[in-house]
Design a protein with these regions (language model features):
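Charged, low-complexity interaction regions
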Residues: 11-20
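Hydrophobic beta-strand-centered segment that forms part of the acyl-chain substrate-binding groove
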Residues: 105-156, 169-171
Length: 222
């Protein structure tokens, strides 16, 4: 009885004024952080998670259907391991969020493990992130992708990261070069990708250029 009372007392002290739901959320956030940490070193449950994510990458991703507007490619909640010392989403996570979301876009046009196995891939040439508003743990972020330009070897993509109420928290633009991974040099984008990518680029060319496209670091804000 003494031991039980001590455990209850210590648990109450640790919980403080948090509700059961808040404690459950904290538990889940901690578990996610541990899983992501283990994934980075490929150990235990993290190894299982990494294999699962690789399997998702290898699987088929449906081709975009409504291409007459920026394409929603991903939604995710901001977890505790993404927060910085200010309590906001760490700036590096917006680059990660954009990069991972555009991976989904690439998979939707047929860029998967089978394509990689042919010795062809995309390499990043340039990226630029703009931080517009803050986001915090628990916020759901929606990422859309828009093709800004496309040529024989390069594709210029722009992503917008917004809260579900439409508040834009960040934007990013990236230029990717299609490469022959054996020769380590640029090469034409495969026809099996262009059959999906070219119509999207044509449709997006009719859209207004997103705010901030082409900006450089240090450029004055009007």
């Amino acid at each position: 009885d003494v031991l039980l009372e001590k455990i209850v007392s210590q648990s109450d002290t640790q919980a403080g004024t948090k509700s059961i739901r808040e404690l459950e959320k904290l538990r889940d956030d901690c578990l996610v952080a541990v899983m992501q940490g283990l994934k980075s070193v490929g150990f235990g449950a993290g190894e299982v998670l990494a294999k699962y994510e690789n399997k998702l990458f290898s699987g088929a991703t449906p081709a975009p259907t409504n291409i007459d507007q920026p394409i929603e490619v991903q939604r995710r909640f901001i977890t505790a391991d993404w927060a910085d010392y200010n309590g906001h989403t760490n700036d590096s996570r917006y680059m990660q969020l954009s990069s991972e979301a555009l991976d989904v876009f690439f998979r939707s046009i047929g860029f998967n493990s089978d394509y990689l196995a042919t010795g062809r891939s995309f390499y990043s040439l340039e990226s630029h992130v703009r931080y517009i508003n803050e986001s915090k743990v628990g916020d759901e972020i929606v990422v859309t992708a828009q093709v800004i330009a496309l040529d024989e070897k390069k594709v210029h993509l722009h992503s917008v990261m917004s809260k579900t109420d439409g508040t834009v928290v960040a934007t990013a633009e990236h230029i990717y070069l299609h490469v022959d991974t054996n020769l380590k040099k640029g090469s034409p984008i495969g026809e099996e990708l262009l059959v999906r990518l070219a119509p999207i680029a044509k449709a997006h060319a009719k859209l207004a250029k997103p705010d901030g496209v082409g900006r450089f670091v240090g450029q004055s804000v009007k």
